[in-house]
Amino acid sequence: MSIRTDKVSSLLQRELSAIFEKELPRSGPLVTVTEVRMTADLGIARVYVSVIGSEAQRAEVMEYLDAENKMIRKTLSAKIRHQFRRIPELEFYEDRLFEQANRIEQLLKSVKPARDEEQH
């Protein structure tokens, strides 16, 4: 990636995080923008979000983001329109890295006691 795409990604991540903080219901699951990847022409922003909640809540949040894509893009445009000629299209993807890390941690914890028992 170039310095320009990195800067745009960082700006979009910051602004989208602020939008989600204001727009999403407080009682729902925790939604975090973990990464934004830009295409080389800056036309598409792939937004990776981490959703901490039940499987149903995660699905609901992803459906909401897809359904409200135009509204989110319009809100983003109002915030950054002076910095860009063209606001990128937004594509939302669920980032399950946190969930996978927790699963690995649980597996490691379950293996460790078995090793300790073998040594005694």
Curated annotation (Swiss-Prot):
One CC-aspect GO term: cytosol
Pfam families, per database record: RBFA (PF02033)
GO MF assignments: ribosomal small subunit binding
UniProt keyword annotations, A-Z: Cytoplasm, Ribosome biogenesis
Subcellular location: Cytoplasm
A biological process from GO: maturation of SSU-rRNA
Major localization class: cytoplasm
Entry annotated with the keyword Cell membrane: no
Membrane spanning residue stretches: none
Superkingdom classification of source: Bacteria
The keyword Cytoplasm belongs to this UniProt entry's keyword annotation: yes
Family that this chain belongs to: Belongs to the RbfA family.
Quaternary structure (record): Monomer. Binds 30S ribosomal subunits, but not 50S ribosomal subunits or 70S ribosomes.
HAMAP family named in the record: RbfA (MF_00003)
NCBIfam families noted in UniProt: rbfA (TIGR00082)
Function description: One of several proteins that assist in the late maturation steps of the functional core of the 30S ribosomal subunit. Associates with free 30S ribosomal subunits (but not with 30S subunits that are part of 70S ribosomes or polysomes). Required for efficient processing of 16S rRNA. May interact with the 5'-terminal helix region of 16S rRNA.
Protein name per Swiss-Prot or TrEMBL: Ribosome-binding factor A
Organism: Chlorobaculum tepidum (strain ATCC 49652 / DSM 12025 / NBRC 103806 / TLS)
